């Protein structure tokens, strides 16, 4: 083992270092493990809700704020960008200063951002609020890492799977809840509800989640690395998200992608030389960690494609001959069971991981996702059929999302768990961004004109579903290269 690897395996006791279990056991005596899991899962659901609550509102924002749709679209885009940038930074700070502390810190911009959105007088203020909300995306990987610290070992696997699946519940519930609030209360009420939930979660974490006994491993923060990664991710994701609207061969998009490569290379050189890097590339290149991160990109693609295609198919007018004519609220209710299905299989996924290993669970999850897409492509005319297909796909997602953090955390030192898990979530976010661009291109490229309006064709929907199926299979193949 060389000197750098020796340094990586240092045994300084940090929050999350698990000398671990003895110290955390006393920390959980006053709080039942089930309560800890419930509170952190609720935090994960809240984070996911924040991402989806605004979706039913996107089409109304141009009218509400008298703004161009290209401007109001930033209410969604900016959340993805700040979330991707914030996750690795929060993860590294959590490894240094404490996961519980950073989890509470991540909730503060969510509370403030929700309030700003609720009172926003114009779209610029709304975008600022949404940017702050996006930082809370890092709560899920932080919560997963914290579970590893404060729970007895025999409960960790199931708890991580449940925490991972909380994203599915939030995504599934977000659409019907937001549609109902907009329809029966007001769009501002949507953000006041988010404000209240986030504030409540802050109090619950502060009161109920124990502090692990530890010594802080204070170290100089890698500001240069944080800035470099932030700029590289912003260039990459902005190029992917805006490629179709700005033009894939436009100077702006090409400049963003070229800038991504240049900045990423320079960032990599810096990270390999800094004593306490934001992302330790020596750890990231370890076999199982590297393979899992690559697989995460494909899993993220496959997970998100379903939520892009099925709602549009359900909401298209039945007069098209293939649309199912559902309202936003009805569509949300048809999609809601998939979130519960994802959570329901979390314990089964944990049992498979315990008995056969996280590699098997990840492969199984990816192949189950592929089956869901295959079924959806066959039953596009049926609401019940699509609901069943979405449930199958979400079950596979639940398996995969529960397995990936386990593979990552089993392959890194205790002092790097939060930052490595956060980086894995960033890889998944890149996959969802690519999915958004690819599916949008497929649907736009096969669109047809109906009464002067361009809409996705049935061929486009089927091609999108088959693309999701193929990507899920690729994710399973990549996962198979993990070592036991």
Stretches found by the model and what they are:
Residues 169-203, 221-229, 236-257:
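Helix-loop-helix hairpin linking two adjacent transmembrane segments in secondary transporters
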Residues 196-214, 230-242, 259-273, 476-482:
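C-terminal membrane-cytosol helix-exit motif in multi-pass small-molecule transporters
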């Amino acid at each position: 083992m060389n000197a750098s690897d020796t340094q990586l395996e240092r045994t300084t006791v940090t929050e999350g270092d698990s000398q671990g279990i003895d110290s955390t056991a006393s920390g959980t005596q006053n709080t039942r493990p089930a309560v800890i899991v419930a509170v952190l899962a609720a935090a994960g659901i809240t984070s996911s809700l924040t991402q989806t609550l605004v979706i039913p509102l996107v089409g109304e924002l141009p009218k509400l704020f008298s703004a161009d749709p290209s401007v109001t679209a930033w209410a969604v885009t900016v959340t993805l960008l700040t979330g991707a940038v914030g996750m690795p930074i929060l993860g590294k700070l959590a490894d240094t200063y404490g996961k519980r502390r950073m989890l509470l810190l991540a909730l503060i911009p969510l509370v403030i951002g929700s309030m700003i959105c609720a009172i926003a007088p114009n779209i610029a203020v709304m975008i600022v609020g949404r940017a702050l909300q996006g930082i809370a995306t890092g709560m899920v990987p932080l919560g997963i890492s914290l579970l590893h610290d404060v729970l007895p070992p025999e409960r960790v696997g199931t708890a991580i799977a449940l925490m991972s699946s909380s994203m599915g519940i939030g995504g599934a519930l977000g659409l019907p809840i937001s549609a109902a609030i907009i329809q029966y209360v007001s769009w501002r009420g949507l953000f006041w509800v988010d404000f209240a939930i986030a504030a409540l979660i802050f109090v619950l974490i502060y009161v109920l989640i124990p502090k692990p006994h530890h010594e802080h491993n204070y170290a100089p923060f890698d500001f240069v690395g944080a800035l470099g990664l932030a700029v590289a991710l912003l260039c990459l994701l902005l190029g992917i998200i805006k490629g179709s609207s700005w033009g894939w061969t436009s100077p702006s998009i090409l400049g963003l992608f070229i800038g991504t490569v240049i900045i990423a290379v320079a960032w990599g050189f810096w990270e390999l030389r800094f004593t306490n890097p934001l992302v330790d590339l020596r750890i990231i290149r370890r076999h199982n960690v590297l393979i899992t991160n690559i697989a995460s990109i494909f899993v993220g693609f496959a997970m998100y494609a379903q939520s892009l295609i099925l709602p549009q198919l359900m909401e298209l007018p039945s007069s098209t001959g293939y649309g199912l004519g559902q309202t936003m609220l009805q569509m949300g209710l048809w999609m809601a069971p998939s979130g519960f299905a994802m959570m329901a299989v979390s314990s089964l996924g944990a049992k498979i991981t315990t008995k056969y290993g996280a590699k098997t669970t990840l492969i199984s999850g990816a192949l189950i996702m592929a089956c869901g897409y295959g079924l959806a492509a066959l039953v596009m005319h049926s609401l019940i059929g699509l609901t069943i297909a979405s449930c199958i796909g979400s079950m596979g997602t639940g398996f995969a999302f529960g397995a990936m953090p386990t593979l990552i955390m089993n392959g890194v030192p205790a002092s790097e768990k939060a930052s490595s898990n956060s980086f894995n979530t960033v890889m998944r976010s890149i996959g969802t961004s690519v999915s958004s661009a690819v599916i949008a291109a497929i649907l736009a490229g096969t669109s047809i004109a109906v009464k002067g309006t361009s809409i996705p064709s049935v061929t486009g929907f089927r091609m999108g579903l088959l693309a999701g199926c193929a990507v899920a299979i690729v994710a399973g193949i990549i996962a198979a290269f993990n070592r036991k």
